[in-house]
UniProtKB/Swiss-Prot annotation:
GO molecular function: ATP binding; DNA binding
Residue intervals passing through the bilayer: none
Chain residues that bind ATP: A207, A208, V209, K210, D211, G212, K213, T214
Record's keyword annotation contains Nucleotide-binding: yes
Gene: yccF
Domain of life of the native organism: Bacteria
Organism: Bacillus subtilis (strain 168)
Protein name as it appears in the record: Uncharacterized protein YccF
């Protein structure tokens, strides 16, 4: 850490002069400050990658043909994961990775030793597919599906909806100060797909191990195959509920995209599979009566899910804030779209409520 002048404000954030605070004693700066700085550096690193090396990282991402067949939400998830993979594991900055170049150019500006220690530890980061084994008092116990290693993450249940036991989590585990975390964000897969998805990924992993790779090398070197298995590869058995969107005639692609977003968003454990056709019928009826102007399909998808919960005779309540986080839109936008749907479908509300409850 650079030398702090005695009369300068103390870097610990106390508001006191350095000579009257940490300068008068040997002290470790709060781990929380280091973790906060590390999170900011995560964002700065990604921004650096997509500005300074925009062409190389975009070319790296777009070489994966499976992206073209994905819906918008799935593609966004894939692009994020491929981007982080490219930043850390591919020499997209000459002979260096983008992360290595970033650390070389900006490392000296990271003055807090603990923060620098956290950031440098990202060099040993490995992508992971984790099975949620247990959840107690905000501590989540994971098992790495590929390496069988155990992993614990502390999550605040008051600030986010915690995934259910049995879920699969895809992400980049790291350590921030005294606790484990994920690099920026992670992806949750529904419990009902866990067994099938693990089977798909292990086919690729087993083949790599037979070729002499370690499980860790497989995740670092063939992460694109993991993404393909999880997000792009078709299930061996056709899912009947998926046919609903494709068999309906839509006025335009945005209406169809919204229907797909509704189906995707409501295919988790909260709702029975047989509910989906009735929900798609609600969206279809609204489109026929209103011909909505759709700027972001996820906004209407969230509003439809909220509407379903509002009118269903046996639906579980769900907040607009929770749906905003789920669909990546604002709560105020959901509120506006919900009012639009509610007013348009006043005459059909009782019929839809009965259909949803039967």
């Amino acid at each position: 850490m650079g030398k702090v002048k005695r009369n300068a404000p103390c870097p610990c954030g106390s508001g006191k002069k350095y000579k009257k605070c940490c300068g008068s004693k040997v002290v470790d700066f709060p781990a929380e400050l280091a973790a906060k700085e590390a999170k900011q550096i995560q964002e700065d690193l990604v921004e650096y990658a997509f500005t300074v090396h925009r062409e190389s990282i975009s070319g790296f991402i777009n070489q994966h043909d499976f992206l073209s067949a994905m819906d918008r939400q799935t593609k966004d998830i894939s692009v994020f994961n491929l981007g982080i993979w490219g930043i850390f594991f591919h020499p997209l900055a000459g002979e260096k990775t983008i992360f290595e170049e970033y650390l070389q150019k900006k490392g000296d500006s990271i003055t807090r030793p603990k923060t620098r220690e956290i950031v440098e530890s990202w060099q040993s980061m490995t992508p992971a597919l984790l099975l949620l084994k247990d959840l107690k008092e905000g501590i989540i116990h994971f098992e790495d599906v590929i390496t069988a290693k155990q992993f614990e993450v502390e999550m605040d249940a008051s600030n986010q909806d915690l995934p259910p036991v049995g879920s699969l989590i895809l992400g980049y585990p790291i350590h921030e100060a005294e606790k484990a975390e994920f690099f920026m964000q992670f992806t949750i897969f529904p419990v009902k797909r866990t067994e099938a998805l693990i089977s798909k990924v292990k086919k690729y992993a087993d083949a790599a191990v037979k070729d002499g790779k370690t499980p860790e090398d497989f995740m670092k070197q063939e992460f694109n195959n993991v993404l393909f298995a999880l997000l792009a590869e078709k299930d061996e058995e056709p899912q009947a509920e998926k046919a609903e969107v494709s068999t309906v005639e839509w006025a335009n692609d945005l209406e169809k995209e919204t229907a797909a977003a509704i189906e995707e968003g409501m295919s988790g454990e909260e709702y029975p599979t047989e509910l989906i056709p009735a929900v798609i019928d609600i969206w279809k009826t609204f489109c026929e009566k209103k011909s909505p102007v759709i700027r972001k399909p996820e906004a209407f998808a969230a509003a439809v899910e909220y509407y379903v919960n509002a009118i269903s005779l046996n639906g579980a309540s769900v907040s607009q804030a929770k749906l905003a986080k789920k669909y990546g839109v604002s709560a105020s936008t959901i509120s506006s779209r919900y009012k639009e749907i509610e007013s348009t479908l006043q005459d059909e509300a009782d019929r839809f409520a009965q259909a949803l409850s039967s």
